[in-house]
């Protein structure tokens, strides 16, 4: 659906915002691109519909290199790419229905069809009763719903989201993500989401790429990235989700007792593994606590354990667990 090959963006001030990016987004993906501020995320997404022009590289949508399109061809292709923004980009002098209609007007829809289409779109986003309101009369979440309705106006195949929830409170963020997921399924959209919020990735994405200093440093299925992050930036972003639990463990170090985090993907269960380890290696295991990451693709369970007994036996027990269908991370080595 969307393929980027060796894409670079260098601005006139010599800022190299996007560096040799290679990315593939398949049809039907809800693909998240996450990174800290200044990582190059927003620059990257604006290249996909050529709001910004890349300095070099190739960008394919449905097998067509959009960099070869002339202005007329590009405008036609853009009708199939909807986009929503952090600050909504609504026209303050237009009502809700007029803001949505604007997207149809510039796409040269027949005037007699615009009213019906606007009504359909407002019903989809739950704002039929706000059609005559102005943006100043709406909450942040309602404004973003108008933005989503406008983005859907021309029946797009692709929806681009540039930090669409970062200005919203957690409750409103959840409702907007639920709406995006609903319309993605209903209209078979491919969604590309820029965010700095790992919670957004957890809630809705099936795949994710992590950006740092203009480069994609890691990418893959969300559950794989959460379970076994490789890059230090990825580990840092994920650590924010588990910050409280991991911080509490720093106060529980006891000499001679290793502390481990055991991660269980999907339906794998922990009890048989733990009981087998206790019997096989003659050690005691205390459970400090656990968390569950409820991802869009599957759940990942995190169990925090303290091992007690002969250190060599503890080490062998960990090595045994690493051969099972779990991921083991040593948090404290008992030294």
Curated annotation (Swiss-Prot):
Catalytic reactions on record: L-methionine(out) + ATP + H2O = L-methionine(in) + ADP + phosphate + H(+); D-methionine(out) + ATP + H2O = D-methionine(in) + ADP + phosphate + H(+)
Enzyme type, top EC level: translocase
GO molecular-function terms, A-Z: ABC-type D-methionine transporter activity; ATP binding; ATP hydrolysis activity
Family annotation (InterPro entries): AAA+_ATPase, ABC_transporter-like_ATP-bd, ABC_transporter-like_CS, ACT-like_dom_sf, MetN_ABC, MetN_ABC_transporter-like, NIL_domain, P-loop_NTPase
Pfam families in the cross-refs: ABC_tran (PF00005), NIL (PF09383)
Membrane topology annotation: Peripheral membrane protein
PANTHER family in the record: AMINO ACID IMPORT ATP-BINDING PROTEIN, METHIONINE IMPORT ATP-BINDING PROTEIN METN
Name by which UniProt lists this protein: Methionine import ATP-binding protein MetN
Residue ranges of every copy of the ABC transporter domain listed in the record: 2-238
Gene Ontology CC: one annotated term: plasma membrane
Domain of life: Bacteria
Binding site for ATP: 35-42
Family: Belongs to the ABC transporter superfamily. Methionine importer (TC 3.A.1.24) family.
UniProt cross-references to PROSITE patterns, sorted A to Z: ABC_TRANSPORTER_1, ABC_TRANSPORTER_2, METN
Described function: Part of the ABC transporter complex MetNIQ involved in methionine import. Responsible for energy coupling to the transport system.
This enzyme's EC code(s): 7.4.2.11
Assembly information from the UniProt record: The complex is composed of two ATP-binding proteins (MetN), two transmembrane proteins (MetI) and a solute-binding protein (MetQ).
Keywords, ordered alphabetically: Amino-acid transport, ATP-binding, Cell inner membrane, Cell membrane, Membrane, Nucleotide-binding, Translocase, Transport
Subcellular compartments: Cell inner membrane
SUPFAM superfamilies for this protein: ACT-like, P-loop containing nucleoside triphosphate hydrolases
Coiled coil: none
